[in-house]
């Protein structure tokens, strides 16, 4: 895959994802490209879809690696939710029905759960920014699995809400 959207480096691993955001989705089949020890390894949409009952895996936005486990990471997507991964294996596929992620179109949550970015703080809490008008734009998942959401760090702009996220390492 030669389409690249964002990259992130954690230790000796470089992650590259191929998604993107637009008013809707680009509907690019998801691909996580990992460079480690001068070797590329891809996790493709076909591999992921086999593990999640053929739910869509499209428009990957970013990757954040667990600071306590170099093979554990999360992938955000613009439309198909948040994926928790261990190597090539999908551990969890989070959507509006099993997390505090919200969907921009409640009738079509599998296509409009827009998780546009994520970070993990020093306590191991995953923070994610959600792109949609039907709920809080900032959600979190604690290490123990507890989900929550907040909106205290938000500014209203032109009828929409813009989250402002600052995480100290």
Model-derived regions: residue spans:
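Carboxylate-rich, polar loop motifs that coordinate divalent cations or form catalytic acidic clusters
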Residues: 1-169
């Amino acid at each position: 895959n030669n389409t690249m959207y964002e990259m992130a480096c954690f230790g000796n691993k470089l992650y590259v994802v191929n998604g993107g955001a637009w008013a809707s989705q680009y509907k690019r089949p998801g691909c996580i490209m990992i460079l480690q020890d001068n070797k590329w390894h891809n996790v493709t949409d076909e591999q992921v879809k086999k593990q999640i009952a053929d739910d869509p895996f499209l428009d990957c936005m970013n990757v954040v690696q667990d600071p306590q486990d170099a093979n554990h990471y999360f992938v955000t997507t613009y439309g198909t939710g948040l994926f928790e991964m261990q190597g090539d294996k999908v551990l969890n596929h989070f959507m509006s029905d099993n997390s505090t992620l919200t969907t921009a179109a409640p009738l079509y949550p599998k296509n409009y759960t827009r998780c546009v970015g994520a970070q993990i703080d020093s306590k191991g809490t995953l923070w994610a920014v959600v792109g949609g008008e039907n709920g809080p734009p900032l959600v979190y998942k604690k290490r123990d699995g507890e989900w929550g959401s907040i909106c205290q760090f938000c500014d209203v702009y032109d009828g929409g809400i813009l989250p402002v996220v600052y995480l100290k390492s």
